[in-house]
Amino acid sequence: MTDAPTPEALTNEPAQASSLPSLAITGASGNVGGTTARLLSERGLPLRLLANTPSRAPELPGAVAVKCSYEDTLTTRSALEGVDVLFMVSAPESEDRLAKHIAFVDAAAASGVRHIVYLSFMNAAPDATFTLARTHFHTEEHIKASGMTYTFLRDNFYADFFVELPDEEGRILGPAGDGRVGVVAREDAGRVAAGVLADPGRYEN
């Protein structure tokens, strides 16, 4: 039985990527990605945690952190060498968010990733009122055309994020009109992602 990597094994050296676990997780230092990584680690699955700053990735049994940046194609391709299944958490909101997503998806396909699980958004569409849902739609379309098999997890707004939104008068301002929303806990989103990643072939879209 091989010993699990120690914290000292955390690395940002892409040259070692080919010998690392074939299940890769982005966003592991965040809420959904962190929950996903923890639950998969508890199942005994070896993980490759992709992070801009590997030292910020959680220290989990069987997990190794590797430096990876969505916009840095060369670093991404090295980090994804030998990866079979990839969990892609969307990049932080920015003007070039879609460009980062496209670059990352292209690098994943070029690196030989077989299956990608993408954390998308409910009702992703090119004309969505919620502008970020448009980015998710175009990311989904690019993944579909990439040649990789895929699973799209379409979350709604996070319940534990809503408490951070009200202004000083208790209002949440946004382009929703009289619309309603069905929220989801980030912990639950992570549990679903972990279940899919543990058996991705069962959930191909």
Regions found by a protein language model. Give the residues of each.
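Oxidoreductase cofactor-interface core, primarily capturing Rossmann-like NAD(P)-dependent enzymes
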Residues: 2-56, 71-74, 81-83, 92-99, ...
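Rossmann-fold cofactor-recognition segment
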Residues: 61-72
